[in-house]
Amino acid sequence: MKRIFSIFLSGIIMAGSVLCVSAQNDVDKKYDSYRESVGSEQATDTVELTPTSNNGKSYEFDIDVPSGNYNIFLNYTVKAVRTDTIKYILKINGECPFAECKNLSAPISYVEESRTFPKDTGGNEISGNLIVSNNAVSAPVCDSEGIFKGNYSFFLGDTSRKLTVEVTDGDIILSSVTLKPAREIPEYAEYSKNNKGKQEGGVIKLNAEHPDNRTSKSIFTFCDASGASVQPVAEDKIVMNALGGSQWRRVGESAEWKIDVPKSGLYELRIKYMQGYTNGRGVSRSFYIDGEVPFKEALNIYFPYSSKWKEMTFSNEKGAYAFYLEKGEHTVTLAVSLGDLSEIIKDCKTVLSELNTVYRRIITLTGVTPDSYRDYQLEDKIPEVIEAIGKEAQRLDAIVERLNKSQKGGTESGVLRRLSRQLKKFNDDPDKIAPQLTQFQSNIS
């Protein structure tokens, strides 16, 4: 029996992530298409590049590396905080390799001004002040919306000469970028096989109220006085003993803790949490060790709904996950993730992209302000578009069914159902398209 590596976060209060779907410009190549076009040649070397020029907002780096697929990491310090996150554009040879590179983001790291909570005149603890960390941050280039799980992989070859990072929002000093061979995250079965035979570890217990850094001030510390199960116990005075709350919900927001591992070995991970904000639905978090996801399943750790404090061991249907940790200092991180919503949102974006194409085809005949009483003969002139409308209605129905099965339907599934009904009306009677075109355009924009 493996020993337990316990993070007793004296509670983590979980909240769900926001389901937000919008269409992207389908003229640009998306990341999936980019990956299919560049192949899977693996890079072998880790390379750090320093800027050859910068004006405080745009940084250029000369690329001279062996051909292969790389993960890119930005190494920076924050000068001043004007926004919640750093926004930037990434280009290779003066062009964004795929559409998502036009809207990338990097986190701002916050730390406690003091590791001791201040107290009021009555001896009650007060949540401490958070300040921007002076430490350098190393952030991977990844999907800030959380739809693609893991870091983006970039192919750099003989024709790759220049990498440009344009900071569009935020005030940072970008000292370097690191190119690492693109990592293929293993399944747990492979990860476990590679660690087979390694000895069991000890017990590590850690309270949650003092994360070593967090990427949002929304991840705040507070007092839970519901009982003795949360440590330290709040009896006759207010004690800061819990972290998180209803505002810890934006995709990517994370909290990180340092741990001192007394001996190398296999550890289980147990967390005490409460998650009572999402009307019976569970939520998901991604789990990192030393900034890396140990195996694919850790990208989507599911926390079932629980309005009371509950201990949960990270596990699958076969039992608890066993994490291998070397002796010494490590970091463990929990970050908000979409979980199984990521594929649903990805499919929604595909449908909306197709419907925007449908809209553009229609207005070539009707114009943007069609005459509601005119017969545009759409069924005769663009029958393939009418057929596409029917197919997209079916795809929306399938998405709604998946949302409902995952218990994450809510208002989002209602919006999709209304759009599906409108599409079915258009498919059954194309004469209704022109009078309702403005509403249709609004629904898909």
Language-model-derived ranges and their functions:
Residues K2-S10:
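Sec-dependent signal peptide recognition
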